[in-house]
Regions:
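Cytoplasmic helix-loop-helix junction between adjacent transmembrane helices
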Residues: 98-122
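Short hydrophobic/alpha-helical segments at membrane-entry points of transmembrane helices
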Residues: 9, 93-99
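Small-residue-mediated transmembrane helix hinge/kink sites in multi-pass secondary transporters
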Residues: 28, 57-61, 114-115
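Conserved MFS/SLC helix-loop-helix module at the cytosolic interface between two early adjacent transmembrane helices
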Residues: 54-93
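Helix-loop boundary and gating motifs at the non-cytosolic
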Residues: 4-40
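Residue-level signature of mid-helix packing/kink "hotspots" within the transmembrane helices
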Residues: 21, 49-57
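Short hydrophobic/aromatic, small-residue-rich stretches within specific transmembrane helices
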Residues: 42-49
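Helix-to-coil boundary motifs at intracellular loop junctions of multi-pass secondary transporters
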Residues: 33-34, 65, 116-121
Length: 122
């Protein structure tokens, strides 16, 4: 059992899940600062959730055929980059694109992370 790799995978999982859960916490600031409607704010949450939910089984099929450990750092990066760029623009369509990108990052991480955790945990 490789405790170092288990710790790294656990930390990576924490980071990706925090990214997915951070959007609802950020929304009140976006609503107040940019006068978003509740519908527009909810659409951002929907985009993040749906992109993750639709893409994750596809990434699972892709990584089941052959190990793709590079999906783990790419997924963590995309999840973080997607949400961190929310503050760089005030255009709604860019927010929608970045939260969708974040959802795809979360989706890319999970299947390969589960496979690798099973491998390193024995």
């Amino acid at each position: 059992m490789n405790y170092r790799n288990i710790g790294l995978l656990t930390a990576s999982h924490l980071v990706t899940d925090i990214n997915q859960g951070a959007l609802p916490a950020i929304l009140p600031f976006l609503i107040a600062e940019h006068h978003l409607s509740y519908q527009a704010a909810a659409s951002l949450v929907f985009a993040l959730s749906m992109s993750s939910s639709i893409a994750q089984p596809l990434f699972g099929l892709y990584s089941d055929r052959m190990s793709k450990p590079w999906l783990i750092p790419i997924g963590v990066f995309l999840a973080g980059a997607g949400l961190s760029t929310l503050g760089l623009t005030s255009k709604y369509w860019l927010w929608f694109a970045t939260v969708t990108l974040s959802g795809i990052g979360v989706a890319a991480f999970h299947p390969e992370g589960a496979r690798l955790m099973n491998f390193v945990a024995g």
